[in-house]
UniProtKB/Swiss-Prot annotation:
Keywords on record: Glycosyltransferase, Transferase
Pfam families for this protein: Ppnp
A GO MF label: thymidine phosphorylase activity
CDD domains: cupin_PpnP-like
Keyword set includes Transferase: yes
Entry's transmembrane regions: none
Enzyme Commission number(s): 2.4.2.1, 2.4.2.2
Protein name: Pyrimidine/purine nucleoside phosphorylase
GO CC terms in record: cytosol
Catalytic activity: a purine D-ribonucleoside + phosphate = a purine nucleobase + alpha-D-ribose 1-phosphate; adenosine + phosphate = alpha-D-ribose 1-phosphate + adenine; cytidine + phosphate = cytosine + alpha-D-ribose 1-phosphate; guanosine + phosphate = alpha-D-ribose 1-phosphate + guanine
Species of provenance: Citrifermentans bemidjiense (strain ATCC BAA-1014 / DSM 16622 / JCM 12645 / Bem)
Known function: Catalyzes the phosphorolysis of diverse nucleosides, yielding D-ribose 1-phosphate and the respective free bases. Can use uridine, adenosine, guanosine, cytidine, thymidine, inosine and xanthosine as substrates. Also catalyzes the reverse reactions.
UniProt similarity note: Belongs to the nucleoside phosphorylase PpnP family.
SUPFAM superfamilies named in the record: RmlC-like cupins
Length: 103
């Protein structure tokens, strides 16, 4: 799906890591939320409240997921899941466009 229809968008941006990671929140008619964002090259650690599905639309990164010491290479067209109440580390090597779905 290349677009979302009949949604609301929160105008205020979510800005993290001194502006190197930004996103906008999209609210669907059923109340579910996703964020659409961009990550610039760098290393970042994110904490989760709920489980997340991270879809990488373009770009490249390595990800260290909870319970795994080894980084996994992720590129545009791929996705990964993160459990609730955990954290994950990313090393973004190319500007990355993403969708985060809260599961």
């Amino acid at each position: 799906m290349s677009e979302f229809n009949n949604v609301s968008v929160v105008k205020e941006a979510n800005i993290y890591f001194e502006g190197k990671v930004t996103s906008r929140t999209v609210i669907f008619p059923d109340g579910s939320r996703k964020t659409l964002g961009l990550m610039l090259p760098g290393e970042y650690t994110f904490n989760t409240g709920s489980a997340e599905l991270m879809e990488i639309l373009s770009g490249e990164m390595t990800v260290v997921l909870p319970g795994s010491p080894d980084p996994v290479a992720i590129k545009g067209g791929e996705a990964f899941e993160v459990p609730e109440n955990s954290s994950f580390k990313v090393n973004v090597t190319a500007v990355s466009d993403y969708i985060c779905s809260f599961l």
